[in-house]
Amino acid sequence: MRKFSLLIVLFSFTSFVFSQQNDVFRVVFWNLENFFDPFVDSTLTYNDYTPEGVQRWTISRFYKKRNNLYKTILSMSEGNPLSIIGLCEIENTFVTTMLFQETPLKRHNYRAIHYEGDDRRGIDVAIVYSVDKLQLVSSEVVKIRNPDNKYFKTRDILYAKFYDKKSDTLHCFVNHWPSRYGGERETVYLRKLAALSLKSKIDSLISVSAEIPKIIVMGDFNDTPYDKSIIDVMGAVPYDKSSKSDTL
């Protein structure tokens, strides 16, 4: 079995710090909880987050949320820009631009990776990275397919490949798997489908890597580390010092 290094971040808000000699490499994931712009999207039937919608989402409320978010990210940075920020529940590129380019976060030189997905509410995932710490090589979405329902739509998995300052390759996945809405048992197979899509992409990376690939998987999985999608499909096990390098 090919060996690889993999970190799985399973929480809705968490951060990890890696030491690279004198450099600090911080990885953060955050579910921004309905970070919508206040404008009507004519391509969607879901427009709750607009001034006339159910949530009465005005431009002033949008700016208030945006300001609270950037202040929190600044406080996490501690004067040293975060290396990678994984986000979910963002509506579009407009909201990431307003957060990272139209606030004091702009001086930290972040860039956002985002693709419009198929979620019925229009919420997506994004990867934000520091261009001073990482060079983007490529990015793409990993689609989650349901062989029993060709009309099935959900949020994509976002994948990005980076080079760090030492020209080492880093692979990053950001996930927001199908929710438990409708019942945990009734929806568990949907999260298994997401896990299968993720595992397939990881396996393909491992198969073509000459060296041990460095892989970060983060997101809101709507499951625990002990659920079937993580244990049975991903094959992940709880970490301890005796864990082998060829296990998740």
Which residues are covered by each model-predicted region?
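Active-site His/acidic residue clusters
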Residues: 43-46, 165-168, 172-190
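Structured beta-strand-rich core segments of catalytic domains in phosphoester-bond hydrolases
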Residues: 90-169, 177
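Active-site flanking residues adjacent to catalytic metal/cofactor-binding acidic residues
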Residues: 30, 88, 175, 219-220
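Bacterial Sec-dependent N-terminal signal peptides
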Residues: 1-22
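Catalytic metal-binding/acid-base residues of hydrolase active sites
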Residues: 33, 91, 178, 221-224
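Metal-dependent phosphoesterases centered on the DNase I-like endonuclease/exonuclease/phosphatase
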Residues: 192-248
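N-terminal, active-site-proximal structural segment of metallo-dependent hydrolase catalytic domains
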Residues: 17-103, 107, 113-123, 195-196
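Active-site-proximal beta-strand elements of phosphoester/diester hydrolases
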Residues: 26-34, 54, 138-140, 169-179
